[in-house]
């Protein structure tokens, strides 16, 4: 996976291709990228555990890039849906730590962003690793908000909507290294 400070590729931000063959090819690419993301998260978790950390890994059921004007509440950022079988362990980890540090590892494939978010609490040596993915073109409003606010949020909830935790990040560019270019491109199109 590419780290946040690696240059972003020049993949277009429009919707994925639409013919049957193109969609099938994209599906295979997305499946491989998702599998690699999960493998990367598990390897990161193993490394942290070898260093003595308690690690919770979560493969999200869905990840939505939500701008402030989207959704039923005031939350904005990446909203991860945590499957019920991960919820108790996630909730317990959140209760144990403050998670003042984070890192993000991302890659893009065929208009989709694949990422692993590391939430780290050095005081308790607890780490939460979240694997998620979303369509890049659906993040335009969030990219603009994150750049304007100079911060980013990660939220976790269950499928039923139970809030499991929210985390503020000062470095939105780890999530969207191409934010300035995308916002300027959007302004040029207006």
Regions picked out by a protein language model, each given a short descriptive name:
Residues 59-122:
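Long, continuous compositionally biased terminal/linker segments
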Residues 53-59:
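Short secondary-structure junctions
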Residues 1-29, 184-190:
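Terminal disorder- and signal-encoded targeting elements
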Residues 32-33:
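A generic structural signal for short
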Residues 127-190:
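Glycine-rich, aromatic-bearing surface loops/beta-hairpins
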Residues 27, 36-37, 47, 51:
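Subunit-assembly interface segments of extracellular/virion macromolecular structures
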């Amino acid at each position: 996976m590419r780290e946040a400070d690696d240059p972003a590729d020049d993949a277009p931000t429009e919707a994925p291709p639409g013919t049957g063959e193109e969609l099938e090819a994209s599906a295979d690419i997305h499946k491989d990228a998702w599998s690699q993301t999960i493998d990367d998260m598990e390897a990161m978790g193993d490394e942290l555990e070898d260093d003595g950390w308690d690690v919770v890994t979560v493969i999200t059921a869905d990840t939505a890039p939500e701008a402030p004007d989207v959704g039923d509440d005031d939350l904005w950022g990446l909203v991860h849906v945590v499957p019920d079988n991960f919820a108790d362990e996630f909730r317990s980890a959140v209760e144990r730590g403050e998670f003042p540090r984070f890192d993000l590892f991302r890659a893009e494939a065929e208009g989709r962003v694949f990422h692993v978010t590391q939430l780290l609490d050095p005081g308790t040596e607890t780490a939460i690793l979240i694997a998620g993915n979303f369509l890049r073109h659906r993040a335009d409003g969030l990219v603009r908000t994150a750049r304007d606010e100079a911060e980013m949020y990660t939220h976790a909830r269950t499928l039923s909507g139970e809030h499991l935790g929210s985390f503020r990040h000062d470095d939105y560019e780890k999530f969207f290294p191409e934010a300035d270019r995308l916002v300027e491109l959007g302004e040029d199109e207006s």
